[in-house]
């Protein structure tokens, strides 16, 4: 398939250069967006009297026939085409004749590509946003069921204070809600400016109606500077950054799932459908999904770094380096979509094991802070209460006891402020339900968080 750009060249391009230059293997995914942009561009050309009404009708008929063949599976994309834009235009011309040759009037591949990427990423972002909403809903549903399941909360991976399973899951729901907001913000900025009509970099002499094409394509307005319109990929970087942040949260959640389903924790049981076995060890039930999410997170980070490094030294306006944007951003999109598609049903079918959580919470003196708070509320300065409780914990460790196993007389050896009500104060359920500060682990707080988060998804 010949190139559209062979103007002054007197020699055919070396086949090795053609192979090196080709992007059809990864930009073919933009074919629908390319056709969408061409339909609007040609309609505008007709409205402005730049091409005839008959040409517009022929172009639209041809583009719709290509689209129909694409949807039916009858369209064969030529792997030897330089890119998807060349393929569409040359296929169109083969079907409708000279009208197809007029489609590119007033347009450059530079603004065409910048438009197609935006349209493609808009659709991808909207799909991912829907996936994140589904995942948040699953987390909320599991949190609602586990709002009363007491478990250890950790710092430094050491048992720290009692929380609930629902409280822990809602932490991730809030994180993902911010990820959703970041994707929405990035998409809103991407949709603010339409590059179509920027030409190669300096606009065009044709009387284009850029406001019409921007509106028809769902943009707020045309970009205000034609050079900027074709020469930046900050929208790719911003969207990839939002996706990388989301992957980071999925990776942290995955790490917790990996720990929780191990025999050392056994806080949850994953459904067999979302685990794998071993080729040699018949007892194994491996959380491969979550391990792969951890691994794939680095892949998305790498894509973000590719985009940043690619753009850092490019002079205005368009440079061929920018062709590398597509593989990076599309791979980031595909990776996040795949992770979300898999992790959501895995979490929906996950079974909590509250008895094991409670047993773990009963060890490790995670009610020590509540013991210190008890003394503080009785009038002892907090620092003194902290030291007193630390001394008690050290003694209990030596004697193989828990705080709850101390008699009242033993408590009073450390302070006369201790009374019978200390046992209620350091009870694990009381420890959780007593933390009534906003956003805390009480059952009422978790249920409110569930309602608040679901309300933000509506």
State where each predicted segment sits.
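Residues in soluble alpha-helical coiled-coils and helical-bundle/repeat scaffolds
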Residues: 47-50, 130, 244, 248, ...
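Short runs of predominantly hydrophobic/aromatic residues within well-ordered alpha helices
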Residues: 38, 85, 89, 236-239, ...
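Glycine-rich cofactor/substrate-binding loops
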Residues: 1-37, 98-99, 281-458
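Generic, well-ordered alpha-helical scaffold segments in large soluble proteins
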Residues: 41, 62-69, 91, 95, ...
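Charged, flexible cofactor/metal-binding loops and thiol motifs
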Residues: 117, 122-124, 129, 144, ...
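A generic structural-conservation signal
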Residues: 54-55, 223, 384, 405
């Amino acid at each position: 398939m010949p190139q559209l750009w062979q103007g002054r060249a007197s020699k055919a391009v070396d086949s090795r250069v053609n192979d090196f230059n080709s992007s059809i293997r990864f930009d073919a995914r933009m074919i629908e967006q390319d056709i969408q942009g061409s339909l609007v561009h040609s309609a505008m050309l007709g409205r402005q009297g730049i091409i005839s009404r008959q040409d517009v009708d022929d172009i639209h008929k041809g583009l719709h026939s290509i689209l129909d063949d694409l949807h039916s599976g009858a369209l064969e994309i030529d792997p030897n085409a330089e890119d998807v834009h060349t393929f569409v235009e040359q296929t169109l011309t083969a079907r409708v004749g000279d009208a197809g040759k007029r489609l590119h009037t007033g347009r450059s591949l530079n603004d065409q590509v910048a438009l197609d990427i935006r349209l493609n990423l808009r659709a991808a972002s909207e799909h991912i946003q829907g996936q994140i909403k589904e995942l948040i809903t699953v987390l909320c549903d599991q949190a609602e069921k586990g709002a009363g399941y007491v478990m250890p909360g950790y710092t430094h991976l050491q048992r720290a204070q009692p929380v609930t399973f629902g409280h822990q899951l809602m932490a991730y729901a809030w994180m993902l809600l911010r990820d959703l907001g970041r994707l929405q913000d990035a998409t809103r900025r991407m949709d603010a400016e339409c590059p179509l009509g920027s030409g190669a970099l300096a606009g065009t002499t044709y009387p284009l109606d850029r406001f019409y094409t921007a509106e028809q394509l769902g943009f707020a307005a045309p970009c205000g500077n034609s050079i900027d319109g074709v020469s930046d990929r900050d929208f790719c970087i911003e969207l990839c950054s939002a996706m990388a942040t989301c992957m980071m949260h999925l990776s942290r959640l995955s790490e917790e799932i990996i720990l929780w389903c191990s025999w050392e924790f056994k806080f949850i049981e994953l459904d067999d459908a979302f685990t794998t076995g071993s080729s040699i060890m018949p007892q194994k039930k491996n959380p491969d999904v979550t391990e792969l999410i951890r691994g794939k997170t680095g892949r998305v980070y790498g894509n973000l770094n590719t985009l940043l490094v690619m753009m850092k030294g490019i002079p205005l306006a368009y440079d061929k380096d920018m062709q590398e944007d597509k593989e990076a951003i599309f791979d980031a999109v595909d990776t996040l979509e795949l992770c979300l598609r898999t992790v959501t049903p895995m979490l929906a079918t996950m079974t909590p094991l509250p008895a094991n959580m409670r047993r773990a919470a009963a060890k490790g003196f995670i009610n020590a802070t509540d013991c210190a708070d008890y003394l503080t509320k009785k009038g002892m300065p907090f620092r003194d209460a902290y030291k007193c409780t630390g001394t008690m914990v050290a003694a209990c460790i030596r004697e193989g006891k828990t705080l709850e196993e101390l008699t009242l007389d033993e408590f009073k050896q450390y302070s006369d402020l201790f009374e019978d009500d200390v046992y209620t104060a350091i009870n694990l359920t009381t420890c959780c339900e007593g933390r009534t500060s906003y956003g805390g682990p009480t059952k009422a707080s978790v249920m409110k968080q569930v309602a608040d988060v679901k309300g933000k998804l509506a």
